[in-house]
Amino acid sequence: SPSLDDERNDNFVRL
């Protein structure tokens, strides 16, 4: 996750 937005997206997808 290069950008913070990507990291948040990853967390959301994991749920």
UniProtKB/Swiss-Prot annotation:
Q: Where are the transmembrane segments?
A: none
Keyword Metal-binding in record = no
Please indicate if the UniProt record lists Cytoplasm as a keyword.
Answer: no
Q: Name one GO biological process term.
A: neuropeptide signaling pathway
Q: Which UniProt keywords apply?
A: Neuropeptide, Secreted
- Sequence similarity: Belongs to the FARP (FMRF amide related peptide) family.
Main role? FMRFamides and FMRFamide-like peptides are neuropeptides.
Q: What is this protein called?
A: Extended FMRFamide-12
Its source organism is: Namaquaphasma ookiepense (Gladiator bug)
